[in-house]
Amino acid sequence: MTYEQIDGLISFVSNSPGQPTGYGQQGAMLVERMVRHGINVAALSNYGLEGVAGELEFAGKKIPHYPRGFKQYSDDVIQPWHEDFVGQNPGVPDAVFTLYDVWVYNDVPPRNDFPTKFISWVPLDHQSLPPAVAKWLLRPNVTPITMSPHGQRQLEAAGIASTYIPHAIDTKVFKPRETMSDGVNAREYLGVKPDEFLVGVVSANKANGLIHRKAYSELVLAWSIFLKSYPKSKLYIHTEPSGIMGGFDLPVLLQACGVPHESVIFPERDRLRKGYSQEDMAALYSAFDVLANPSYGEGFGVPAVEAQACGTRVICSGWAASADLVAEDGLLLQGVPFWDEPQKAWWSIPLVDSIFNALVEAYKAERGPSKVAREFASQFDAERVWKWGWLPFLREFFK
């Protein structure tokens, strides 16, 4: 197949494309298509393969991979790495593309010292716009791309123009699947009986040691209450259970809430560390009767879309990006405002009774794959999003 070619150069600043993180997976899908359409791409890593100065392969071509810098978010090396890449490809229209929280880039030299254009695919996970985020997006050489309708509305209210292009998934992979890649039935793999109600959670256990954006404490407390009335239920939490990455010690939290250890399942630690394949994740999503994804605020929330593509209904927060990412048969939570002092903006905390009520409603609902959820998730197919979103945007940007 012959693809339209775009004459452009992009330094892609994010997690290393292809790594088993949300940004890594989004980066891989996007970089693959950029390279396919003739754009020169270099990966500027802030996580994943951060020590590697070498090459990655996408669309049958080698692209350079630059290592991280000395600062936490590698913003100290954006300018030198980009200028190095541009120097190897003189005369090509260029840009730096960021897929990360943009407040970390406010120390990047201003346009007078670093005149390169920036494209920032920005997560907006608060109910009000953080000033540090607005500061970056208001730079005259920054073009914002919002990944949710919520984000676009939020920027519009602040007088900041943006283009909406959502995160994407591969719907050829994320679809109803009964078995893992080794042929084992997913529910059997988890040790869940056919008549048991299975709630799944796919949320990173990363926090600042005090506040957990993924609302694990509220979810676990709600689960402890739910389990008393519906004991034939299991909770699968697809995350690292210890607090080793700055998150919560989930076994201690579960014990503090009186949750029997046999009602909770965690993934195999070594397998989790290496990363479950997307096919195996699709099988796990398909095994869930519902995905519980409460949060103080989401910039997007890929697991909710992946689960729905597999026919699994979801429970999500009814604010920030999540509110626009739930099908009609999904469930939205209520919350109370919470001030995020470091970001100077509002989140919301999901109410425990709202999570409990959503679990009960999901328990009483019809089981099995949801056609409504699958149809809703189809709009986020990677090739569809590329054709209606990224391709026309990049064509116009580099013309």
Language-model-detected regions and their locations in the chain:
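Short hydrophobic beta-strand element within catalytic cores of glycosyltransferases
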Residues: 304, 313-316, 326, 331
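Nucleotide-activated donor-binding/catalytic signature segment of Leloir-type glycosyltransferases, i.e.
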Residues: 247-283
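A short helix/loop element that forms part of the nucleotide-sugar donor recognition site in Leloir-type
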Residues: 175-192
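Carbohydrate-associated surface elements
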Residues: 150, 168
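Conserved donor-binding/catalytic core segment of Leloir-type glycosyltransferases
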Residues: 11, 193-214, 220-223, 235-237
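A charged, aromatic-enriched C-terminal amphipathic alpha-helix characteristic of glycosyltransferases
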Residues: 350, 364-394
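Aromatic "clamp/platform" in nucleotide-sugar-dependent glycosyltransferases that forms part
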Residues: 296
